Amino acid sequence: ETVEFATKPSLACAMIQRALSTDVPFSWVAADSVYGVGSIEMTLRRAAKRYVLGVSSRHGFTSWGKSYAVSGTAKEIAAALPEDAWKRLSSGDGTKGARLHDWAYLDLADLDAGDFGADFTGTWTRGLLIRRNIADGDTSYFTTWCPQGTSIETLTRIEGHRWAIEDSFETAKNELGLDHNETRSWHGWHRHVSLVMLAFAMTAVIR
């Protein structure tokens, strides 16, 4: 009765806040577009944490303080890029080898980290990372926040870490029965998931 509905972005913010308050060591956060931006972005910036966060094709981007001007939706900006702006990179290894895509990165604004926390120093960059599927040209978009000079190779590698989470879910479902649960109560669901996660942790150590 004390559990209230919460959106995925608010759940993610609460998770990040708990990690920060208990000094969990981490430098990057990667997420797909379902988690949104805005509050998550500000939470991470104020904690001096880097991020690669998925956004929709309609998300707007604008450059400032740069020698070049960029303004428009993520989709419009990607469509206007010349072919030599793209770089073929692997975001990590999958079951069939390297996950190769074409990538483009635009650093849009350099900001003083001190604007987000009195103890922070240095220049950080807000950017737009774009992933294009080699086979069909389908594109995905990410807003980024990282120290100035961070390479596109680093950003693509961080984005690729999300796949490990998806692989873990698949393993937990196929081998440990994560989705084999039809209880309707919170306690029943929570106990089932907790036991599956314990089993998953044990198998990860054994392997």
Q: What are these model-derived regions, one by one?
A:
Residues 1-5, 50-164:
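An anionic, glycine-rich sequence signature occurring as long contiguous blocks
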Residues 1-53, 57-60, 67, 129:
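Conserved, well-structured functional cores that handle cations and Mg-NTP chemistry
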Residues 6, 188-196:
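Short, conserved micro-motifs enriched in small and acidic residues
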Residues 25, 164-169, 181, 207:
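Intrinsically disordered or highly flexible coil/loop and linker segments, enriched in small
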Residues 29-35, 51, 142, 163-172, ...:
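Short, conserved catalytic/metal-binding motifs centered on acidic residues
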Residues 41, 144, 150-159, 173-191:
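Short, solvent-exposed helix-loop connector elements
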Residues 160, 164, 173, 177, ...:
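Hydrophobic alpha-helix feature that most strongly marks membrane-spanning transmembrane helices
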Residues 193-206:
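Short, hydrophobic/amphipathic alpha-helical patches that form generic packing surfaces
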